[in-house]
Amino acid sequence: MWVLFLATFCGLGASLTAVDNLGQIGESLGYPNKTVTSFVSLVSIWNFFGRVFSGFVSETLIVKYKVPRPLMMTLVLLLACIGYVLVAFPMPGSLYVASIIIGFSFGAQLPLIFAIISELFGLKYYSTLFNCGQLASPLGSYIFNVKLTGFLYDREAMKDLAKKGLTRSSVKALTCIGSHCYRLPFIILTFVTFFGALTSLILVVRTRNYYRSDIYKKFRENAESL
């Protein structure tokens, strides 16, 4: 469970951080407000597609090819890394692609996490383990969003103020304009998510024999006993 918790902490924590900051990222890169709204809409739309896709595809791979579901989690986290790199090193229009990737990978993680919990640990303590898995999400978001991204963004904004000869007391809110504002935070998020992918890969190795067996046998037996 701790391996899955760590992968969830890294994956969902980084994804929530990216989603929460997407509007401000667009502002920093000079996109108009209407375009920034489009980025948020793209995240929401592809979040839905990610949930449907990961559930359907991972189930098909298990039934037909006995592929461990955690492998799908690994691939989703690696995909998320691409989205973060596009934010850290933006090109013209690249934030559109980043929004799609971030939204898709964020949505894809959720069904996988809770399906993996039920398959590996059963339903007896599912509610407890479910909430433990849920805890990793806000915990990761707080650390990566508030303590990391927010701190580094404010630091870059203060540097911009110093270049203009201004002080913190002379402005109402800190605003950073330029690609440098989110570069370091998203480089760190990329490495954190990659570490989460490696962690989930450990789970793939440890569960490959289990997924080669009839994993739904115990669920059928429980249903028949009712």
Named regions from a protein language model:
Residues 1-56, 110, 114-117, 141-149:
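Extracytoplasmic gate region of multi-pass secondary transporters
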Residues 7-12, 44, 84, 98-103, ...:
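Helical-face signature of the major facilitator-like transporter fold
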Residues 88-98:
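Helix-loop junctions at membrane interfaces in 12-TM secondary transporters
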